[in-house]
Amino acid sequence: MSNCKFTLAQLADHLDAQMVGDANYTVECIAPLESAGKNALSFLANSKYEKALATSQAGIMLLAQDSAEKFNGNKLIVKNPYLCYAKLSELFNFRLAKKQGVHPSATVDADATVAADAYIGPNCVIEAGAVIGGGTQLGAGCFVGADTKLGNNCLLHANVTLYAGVELGNKVLIHSGTVIGSDGFGFAPSAEGWVKIHQLGGVVIGNNVEIGSNTSIDRGALDDTIIEDGVIIDNLVHIAHNVKIGAGSAIAGCVGIAGSAVIGKNCTVAGMVAINGHITIADNTHFHGGTIVTKGVKESGAYASAPPMQEVSKWRRNAVRYGQLDEWVEKIKALQKAQKD
């Protein structure tokens, strides 16, 4: 639970919301409709849960105008309750409290630059030429390679690895176990076996980017791998060398993006999507979960390729029939030709 406390009036001012009730009423956490107590703020973002307003014990309710009359307690009336909930969540997140200084167990090279108000946690390693911007926080066990640059107010949770030559903008948040700047999968075949292509590019990440845990973003072969401003990336995502992801795009868990793919701006890629290399995806393109993207997309829109779930016996029959499609196409062509003759 957060140690923060806010009055109805303070929250209304923060959101520029219409306030109804006791201006001095105080809450100290955010909770779901069903479990919220008198010390909690709750919210209604989906009308299908509107009936719960009648029994909710929340001290303050965040909701839209068309639902306001159905809650009799203290309330904040806004146009978009879900967006406002997101904004308030930062206020109640006590884990964001900042620290300053370098932990005694950290190793910081003499040629690295660390802002006075940054924090370097236990057992971190900062190599020569690295730059850590103002207000940036590194959790325990983070590694920052040579000449890597972090902007202001970044947050790296424990055990994040940034190889040499990586650049982060401002307000980049990276969760534990993520590796940025490892070698791309580049090898040239020869009679003697695979010959490694050393990856000479870097990774450039823009401002206000969030990256989940155990995600891997490879460095470029020659040019950089680029993640533009405002991109959000989930856990367990693999982004290969020289990929470019446009501003404002969202990549869900277990997505794999092959080398040199270009994802446009404001795209959404649902879980388990696989994107082929060396293709370009238009801005505002949306892929449903499990889609296998084998070619580029020139027109924005929603795309899907994975078959929906079926009862297993039906799926088996359809799988057999799928294997017979080519045979049936040839039979249909023969019948059509016979009719013409």
Swiss-Prot record:
Q: Which GO terms describe its molecular function?
A: N-acyltransferase activity
Per the record, its GO cellular-component terms are:
membrane
Q: Which reaction does it catalyse?
A: a UDP-3-O-[(3R)-3-hydroxyacyl]-alpha-D-glucosamine + a (3R)-hydroxyacyl-[ACP] = a UDP-2-N,3-O-bis[(3R)-3-hydroxyacyl]-alpha-D-glucosamine + holo-[ACP] + H(+)
One family from Pfam that matches here is Hexapep
Q: Where is the active site?
A: H241
Q: Which NCBIfam families match?
A: lipid_A_lpxD, PRK00892.1
Name it: UDP-3-O-acylglucosamine N-acyltransferase
The organism of origin for this protein:
Saccharophagus degradans (strain 2-40 / ATCC 43961 / DSM 17024)
Gene designation per UniProt: lpxD
